[in-house]
């Protein structure tokens, strides 16, 4: 019996793995196992209240740890890491994604075969192996008529839970827009790449397990659900405001507010603490966002 072939060392040396943690201490042990042998790893901690930083220092001593003074959001934290990357590629990796050196090397080697590509993602699966929907096509360009990807695809959007970046192609376009605290930052990034005629590839032969919503853990899960609803609603509105204008964002807010009120009422009548917290967070997020003030701030800054 022959020993398994080790992942190409050259491929691993060409990439820096970037991880953003926020109360993600429970994920660090699995990350450390999967990334053993990866020479370049940067972890950015978004002011966690748990022992995420201590576990990174203990279990991933070779990783560079950047501690943010406050939670600046997913995009801003990744930007802090991207600014430090000196390799050809960067790999964004959510703490709740289980990967290893073979998968990382396969992503890098596949990307090298497509020198025009800016971004590339694997096929994500859940813990049972079921495929997750982590990419889509621009609806105004064409409508897909097939099922799951069976070969390399060039798409309009790909989820940044696991995303390989060719640095020389993304730098001129800019990294994540810190306007988006959480959610829609990858939609915005992909749209800018797509508008610049960049390639966003899906590499379905590489599969990575994504334990969706597993990055953050605490003793108040309803609070995490409230935050998800709050930031998802705000980021959705901000995306529309940025790319379609304030009038479109106002119309969207009216529609989503109406549906959010109905959703809250439904969750009160059919109690589910987590779903009620998420629905209430969505409602509050929409109410709290001042589009007019935001427009004035951006006009003054720009």
Named regions from a protein language model:
Residues 227-234, 246-302:
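Non-catalytic, C-terminal membrane-associated alpha-helical segments of glycosyltransferases
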Residues 171, 175-181, 187-209:
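Catalytic donor-sugar/metal-binding loop of nucleotide-sugar-dependent glycosyltransferases
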Residues 209-234, 274:
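Nucleotide-sugar-dependent glycosyltransferase catalytic core
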Residues 19-37:
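Short, well-formed alpha-helical segments that are part of the catalytic scaffolds
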Residues 70, 76-84, 97-181, 187:
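Acidic/His-rich active-site region of diverse nucleotide-sugar glycosyltransferases
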Residues 45-54, 70:
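A conserved acidic beta->alpha catalytic loop
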Residues 26-30, 50-58:
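Acidic helix N-cap motif at the loop->helix transition within catalytic regions
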Residues 90:
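Short aromatic/hydrophobic "clamp" motif used to bind/position activated sugar donors
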């Amino acid at each position: 019996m022959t020993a398994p072939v080790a992942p190409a060392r050259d491929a691993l040396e060409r990439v820096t793995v970037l991880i953003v943690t926020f109360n993600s201490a429970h994920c660090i042990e699995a990350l450390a196992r999967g990334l053993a042998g990866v020479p370049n790893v940067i972890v950015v901690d978004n002011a966690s209240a748990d022992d995420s930083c201590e576990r990174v220092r203990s279990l991933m001593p070779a990783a560079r740890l950047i501690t943010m003074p406050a939670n600046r959001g997913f995009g801003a934290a990744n930007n802090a890491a991207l600014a430090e990357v000196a390799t050809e590629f960067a790999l964004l990796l959510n703490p709740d994604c289980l990967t290893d050196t073979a998968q990382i090397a396969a992503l890098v080697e596949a990307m090298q075969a497509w020198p025009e590509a800016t971004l590339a993602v694997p096929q994500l699966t859940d813990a049972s192996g079921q495929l997750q929907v982590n990419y889509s096509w621009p609806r105004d360009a064409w409508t897909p008529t097939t099922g799951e990807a069976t070969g390399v695809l060039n798409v309009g959007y790909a989820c940044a839970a696991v995303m390989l970046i060719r640095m020389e192609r993304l730098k001129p376009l800019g990294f994540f827009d810190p306007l988006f605290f959480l959610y829609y930052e990858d939609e915005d990034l992909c749209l800018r790449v797509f508008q610049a005629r960049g390639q966003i590839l899906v590499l379905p032969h590489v599969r990575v397990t994504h334990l969706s919503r597993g990055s953050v853990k605490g003793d108040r899960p309803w609070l995490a659900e409230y935050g998800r609803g709050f930031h998802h609603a705000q980021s959705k509105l901000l995306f529309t405001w940025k790319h379609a204008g304030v009038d479109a964002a106002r119309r969207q807010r009216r529609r989503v507010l109406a549906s959010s009120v109905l959703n809250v009422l439904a969750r009160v009548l059919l109690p589910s603490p987590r779903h009620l917290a998420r629905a209430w967070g969505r409602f509050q997020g929409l109410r709290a966002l001042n589009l007019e003030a935001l427009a004035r701030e951006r006009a003054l800054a720009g």
